[in-house]
Amino acid sequence: MAKQDYYEILGVSKTAEEREIKKAYKRLAMKYHPDRNQGDKEAETKFKEIKEAYEVLTDSQKRAAYDQYGHAAFEQGGMGGGGFGGGADFSDIFGDVFGDIFGGGRGRQRAARGADLRYNMELTLEEAVRGVTKEIRIPTLEECDVCHGSGAKPGTQPQTCPTCHGSGQVQMRQGFFAVQQTCPHCQGRGTLIKDPCNKCHGHGRVERSKTLSVKIPAGVDTGDRIRLAGEGEAGEHGAPAGDLYVQVQVKQHPIFEREGNNLYCEVPINFAMAALGGEIEVPTLDGRVKLKVPGETQTGKLFRMRGKGVKSVRGGAQGDLLCRVVVETPVGLNEKQKQLLQELQESFGGPTGEHNSPRSKSFFDGVKKFFDDLTR
């Protein structure tokens, strides 16, 4: 079957500069890398084609030969005696790019770092504002306490891989050229476990639940994450452990709402207090405090109590408490109260008293003008 054009494989033009080729290779290598497509033979074949195309097109001599002779340039005898020499070693062809993407393309493959874990923690507003220490229990993978992460039975050691001789890489011939690939026998580790540990069966890790004490700093809010370094899953065969991320979710409070570092609450007052003014008690997270309400206070007026909000988890000034006044209409009036209110209303000059209810007057004046305009 005819081989696909190297330029088409990478999706670049025949005049593409090296940086364009490198960029295309990085993108495709990430997409088709075997670690991301385990068990996918089609992706594995595609990845090999991408590597082969990159090897040729980023080498000026190889690229010139390919542009002139095509794939025949790299077949045995394809260029007569004028090739690059059968003994050429291009083992470092992927060093700079492939290593940047996957953490080192040459040499033995590092054991995989442990996976990061996430734990969702629900807090009350009081806990979030003041800070709290909580114990949590999480399922995880921990280092095997029998083999101490090696995967080998106690008294034995992992043996050097006979295929790659411990390098983790094997050399594959392609025409005149040699490329290095991950050893299929040891998967790049350079060692094999002949006598696996009876407890972890050679994995070096076991499933276990552990209890942790998590200190939540004061001022956290929904969406904040707390990182516990090294408290994730244990790494493979002694590799570093991952991290644990505690995701904060603050429960809804029956009185307060939080916006940033400020707290908001609604304070109901009766219409007499709103009209005459006075002193009321309002709740804060530190207890009750007195608030002076001036006369003629309207519904919706905000009163700011400085420093009664939330202390920022990132430092800086403490937030405020903003109390929104809601003037309540009285219900369940007795006859005497109704009579007094009737007298009060008459003293205002009726339901739309102009002097004592300026907003009411403004509204009804607007309504009158609206209908007058309609009848003209």
Swiss-Prot record:
One GO CC term, this protein: cytoplasm
UniProt cross-references to SMART domains, sorted A to Z: DnaJ (SM00271)
Sorted UniProt keywords: Chaperone, Cytoplasm, DNA replication, Metal-binding, Repeat, Stress response, Zinc, Zinc-finger
Superkingdom field: Bacteria
Keyword GTP-binding: no
Required cofactor names: Zn(2+)
Localization (cell): Cytoplasm
Ranges in a coiled coil: none
ZnF (CR-type) residues: 131-209
One GO MF term: zinc ion binding
Residue numbers binding Zn(2+) 1: C144, C147, C197, C200
Domain J: 5-70
BP term (GO), one: protein refolding
Annotated binding of Zn(2+) 2, by residue: C161, C164, C183, C186
Tagged with keyword Cytoplasm: yes
Alphabetized PROSITE patterns for the sequence: DNAJ_1 (PS00636), DNAJ_2 (PS50076), ZF_CR (PS51188)
CXXCXGXG motif repeats: 144-151, 161-168, 183-190, 197-204
HAMAP family found in the cross-reference section: DnaJ
Function: Participates actively in the response to hyperosmotic and heat shock by preventing the aggregation of stress-denatured proteins and by disaggregating proteins, also in an autonomous, DnaK-independent fashion. Unfolded proteins bind initially to DnaJ; upon interaction with the DnaJ-bound protein, DnaK hydrolyzes its bound ATP, resulting in the formation of a stable complex. GrpE releases ADP from DnaK; ATP binding to DnaK triggers the release of the substrate protein, thus completing the reaction cycle.
Family: Belongs to the DnaJ family.
Domain notes: The J domain is necessary and sufficient to stimulate DnaK ATPase activity. Zinc center 1 plays an important role in the autonomous, DnaK-independent chaperone activity of DnaJ. Zinc center 2 is essential for interaction with DnaK and for DnaJ activity.
Protein name: Chaperone protein DnaJ
